[in-house]
Amino acid sequence: MHRNDFTCFTQSVYTKKDGSVESQICCLTNRIVKLTRHFQTHRKDYSSQRGLWKILGRRKRLLIYLLQTDAIGYRDLTTQLKIRKLKKK
């Protein structure tokens, strides 16, 4: 998957308002993919790893909120973005 393919994919997946939970999750997923691609060449970039962990935590909190408010939308979004579902506690 090329760099521009993923951005177009996330923009085409969700076309509602920019501030909605789904669009925020799409943007965070896009940033996560870019950072993981960055780590393939820069393995010891620990400050960026910390930023990645913060982004992952923010996306996880948004996914929990989406699951609690709209379970069907959560399921659709996780399948469209091809991300794993949350673990049950």
UniProtKB/Swiss-Prot annotation:
It holds the Pfam family Ribosomal_S15. Belongs to the universal ribosomal protein uS15 family. PROSITE patterns: RIBOSOMAL_S15. Coiled coil: none annotated. Signal peptide: none annotated. It comes from the Eukaryota. It comes from Aneura mirabilis. GO terms for cellular component: plastid; ribonucleoprotein complex; ribosome. Keywords: Plastid, Ribonucleoprotein, Ribosomal protein. Part of the 30S ribosomal subunit. The gene is rps15. Its main location: plastid. One of its GO terms (biological process) is translation. NCBIfam families: S15_bact (TIGR00952). CDD domains: S15_NS1_EPRS_RNA-bind (cd00677). This is Small ribosomal subunit protein uS15c. It is found in: Plastid. One of its GO terms (molecular function) is structural constituent of ribosome.
